Amino acid sequence: MAAVTLPTHYRNVFAELGYAQAEIDARIENTFHTIFYGDEAHRFYHPTGPGLAYIEDTGNHDVRTEGMSYGMMLCVQTDHKAEFDALWSWVMHYMYMQDGPNAGYFAWSCQPDGTPNANGPAPDGEEYFAMALFFAAGRWGCGSGIYDYAAMARCILHSCLHKGEKPGTGRPMWDPENHLIKFITECDFTDPSYHLPHFYTLFSLWADEADRPFWAEAARASRAFLHKACHPVTGLCAEYSLYDGTPHNRSDRDQRHDLYYSDAYRTIANMALDYAWFGADPWQAENAERLQKFFCETLCGRTNGIWEIDGTSLPGEALHPVAITATNAQASLAAGGPNAEVCVRRFWNTPLRDGPRRYYDNCLYFFALLALSGRYRIWPL
């Protein structure tokens, strides 16, 4: 495997553009407080008893592995260990599956009282859980039991790769042949926004030693896949894709998923963070510039639409326009040129979202805020 060099400096794009550090720090602190401890109209972190708490998907009124793992990542990046442990404890108490073909995975959706809505996992939750746990180990050290963060991360990743090797033990979350993450374990297609090569690079250092070559190859494979999934002019990708990058629309669903829509917004932010941490793929900067040009010049700043990946506008409005603004800004970690500054300043002037759809938008908002301030960091073991 190629040697991995961890970053020693994290860009503070806000400071580069002249924002005062005290102002940046206050924005981060206020954002955390609003999401975790604001009034009922704004927060979506909910303590449920001693040492337990959940993140609510306010648009769907449930608790998802996506949101719980996002919350844990936000907590470790902002040094809030008590909240991290409360979320992780809720996950292990209510979401962890101990029996059946999905044993070792997490039920992707539960009701706020912990009742499972599903008995299957969604792989984006598992990969974020593992990464957040490794960072917790690096930042705070490990405890015992479920708070032996690094051991728990390795257990999750072992399940992700090795389930199904024995009959009746379920399916893996990564295709063992092409090294690409699946949308769900039983489907042979993917979601471009699930591809986190920067995480896999770190897994290649910290996962079970026997699996480290797989994770190194997964990082390479995901970077190559994203070239195929993103449109060569607009930089956009679909929510779901075949392994060759072709947009994919599930035949068993009424809603289209071959468009630039909710899940897809995360993809450009993920690639920008990969570029900021490792700089392994210069194409990521080129693609970020294409996407910003599409939104800033072709669309003249509009972020509330629905588009084919070639930029064709469709009827309807985006459910999560603030998420688009946030991820367009995070793309500036990779992009250069005048549109990078425009996107960051537009984001800085955008408030957190109110209303029932605030969960997804405000999670991506907080990630972008941390990334653009140099506060979304690797916490090495």
Task: Put a short name on every predicted segment.
Residues A2-N30, T34-Y37, H42-R43, H61-T65, ...:
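Extended ligand-binding clefts on enzyme/binding-domain cores
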Residues R27-Y70, C75-M97, N102-A118:
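Internal amphipathic alpha-helical repeat/solenoid segments
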Residues H61-M68, T115-G141:
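Aromatic-rich carbohydrate-recognition surfaces in CAZymes
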Residues G71, E83-F84, I146, A153, ...:
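Solenoid-repeat scaffolds in large eukaryotic assemblies
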Residues M72-D79, Y128-R139, H198-L205, A269-A276, ...:
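Short glycine/serine- and small hydrophobic-enriched flexible loop segments
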Residues C75, W88, L133, A150, ...:
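Inward-facing hydrophobic residues that define packing positions of alpha-helical scaffold repeats
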Residues A82, A86-W90, Y94, A122-L133, ...:
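Outer membrane beta-barrel
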Residues I306-L381:
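C-terminal functional modules
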